[in-house]
Amino acid sequence: MNLIEPKFKLLVYDKKQFKDKDEANNNIALIKNRILDYPKECSIKEIAYYCTNGYPICFSYGIRNNRSSSKAYRDNNWREQQLIAIDIDNKDRQRYTTIDEAICLCKNNGITPSIVYTTLSSTDIINKYRII
């Protein structure tokens, strides 16, 4: 039996890879212009590849009302989203949550993460990660 892997609609990502958070932040305006108008359909495997290899990714899709406006892509333009991503930055050291603890919390609440990965801003001292 061949199983068909589902594709998630209206997912956008940038074709440029970034090696660190500073480089990505310095290019945020360019990234937004490149990705906002080009939704893609991606499988979980494809999404995992993009997320873990430094590609900027957005899990929602919206309509820009004005291409030249920096405020053209806002909440009121949001149209659809099939995946939810939760960022754990562990800013509060007294409430530090390990990846294993976060996965356990999800499962205890009926949520099974599809992808969990450390983000570009993660360090050996403060683990930062995303759960999808």
Locations of the language-model features?
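Signature for HUH/AEP ssDNA processing cores
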Residues: 1-129
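Extracellular, beta-strand-rich glycan-interacting domains
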Residues: 132
